[in-house]
């Protein structure tokens, strides 16, 4: 049965967030949809554009969780632990309160764990992935993603592509991985650029934008690398659009952006693999001696 009482929908969204507003057509979903031929292990939505708030416990008997299927879908979870899969289309999936597992699937998605210790993965496409409160495990998958831990001690893994990472509050682990096709070329300059410089540097690797040593942030090295296997250098960069590299977080997805392109002159530490010279990542506004590193096993980051 479907209901459209928005007051009841809002009451069920126990920790409604200010980041992502509900669409006006959202409905409360209290029972499976009549999708003939669906796999009983999954809770399938329709192949159209759906907008649902999940009632508590609605996914309890479907071990494979929710599949949004085709369409540009909006799903807000309940207060329980839920498994959601966006599949194809531009989807917005919000976990709600509970330790949720959320995967975007194909295309551009906006994913938000909200409250609870969540696993959130963009999978394919250029995604926005937010952890929310508690200690979250966040990964980008393929594509150029924006990852935001928010509060709690989070683990952020960009995976493939050139990603932007914000840990926000808490002691966060930013995991850098070696990638096929990584560049070993030089970037930026040793001195600040002259006033009026508009020669923009291409960001070649994952960019950590709010590393905070005072909060206990560390950088995790994957692939068997240790601190002895990397070299650090400090460079001055000219990058843009500046709104995509603010230390406070990404420009809101769907936000109205004025047309002018904005330049940011900043300083960053460049992290390279010593043996190949390949750039593993960059860290904004932090000097090399402020960075702390740990080695992370492939098993520790295999979740996905």
Name each region found by the language model:
Residues 1-59, 63, 70, 173-190, ...:
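GD-rich hexapeptide-repeat beta-solenoids
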Residues 56-67, 72-76, 81-235:
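Acidic, glycine-rich calcium-binding repeat modules characteristic of RTX/beta-roll
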Residues 51, 216, 266-270:
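A generic structural signal for beta-strand entry/edge sites
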Residues 1-40, 237-304:
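Low-complexity acidic/polar repeat-biased segments
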Residues 38-47, 73-77, 218-225, 278-285:
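Short, exposed beta-strand "edge-strand" segments with a Pro/Gly-rich flavor and a Y/T-containing core
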């Amino acid at each position: 049965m479907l209901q459209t009482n928005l007051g009841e929908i809002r009451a069920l969204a126990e920790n409604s967030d200010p980041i992502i507003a509900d669409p006006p057509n959202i409905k409360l979903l209290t029972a499976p949809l009549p999708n003939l031929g669906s796999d009983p292990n999954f809770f399938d939505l329709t192949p159209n554009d759906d907008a649902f708030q999940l009632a508590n416990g609605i996914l309890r008997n479907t071990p494979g969780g929710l599949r949004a299927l085709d369409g540009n879908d909006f799903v807000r979870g309940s207060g329980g632990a839920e498994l959601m899969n966006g599949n194809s289309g531009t989807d917005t999936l919000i976990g709600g309160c509970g330790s949720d597992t959320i995967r975007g699937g194909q295309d551009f998605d906006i994913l938000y764990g909200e409250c609870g210790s969540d696993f959130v993965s963009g999978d394919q496409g250029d995604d926005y992935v937010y952890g929310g409160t508690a200690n979250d495990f966040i990964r980008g998958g393929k594509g150029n993603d924006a990852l935001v831990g928010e509060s709690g001690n989070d683990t952020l893994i960009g995976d493939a592509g050139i990603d932007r990472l914000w840990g926000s509050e808490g002691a966060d682990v930013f995991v850098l991985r070696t990638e096929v096709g990584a560049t070993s070329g030089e970037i930026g300059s040793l001195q600040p650029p002259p006033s009026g410089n508009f020669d923009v540097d291409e960001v070649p690797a994952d960019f950590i934008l709010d590393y905070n040593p005072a909060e206990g942030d560390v950088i995790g090295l994957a692939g068997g690398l240790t601190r002895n296997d990397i070299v650090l250098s400090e460079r001055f960069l000219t990058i843009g659009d500046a709104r995509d590299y603010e230390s406070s977080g990404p420009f809101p997805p769907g936000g109205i952006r004025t047309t002018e392109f904005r330049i940011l002159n900043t300083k960053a530490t460049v992290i390279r693999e010593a043996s190949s010279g390949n750039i593993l990542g960059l860290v904004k506004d932090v000097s090399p001696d402020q960075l702390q590193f740990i080695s992370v096993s492939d098993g520790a980051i295999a979740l996905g």
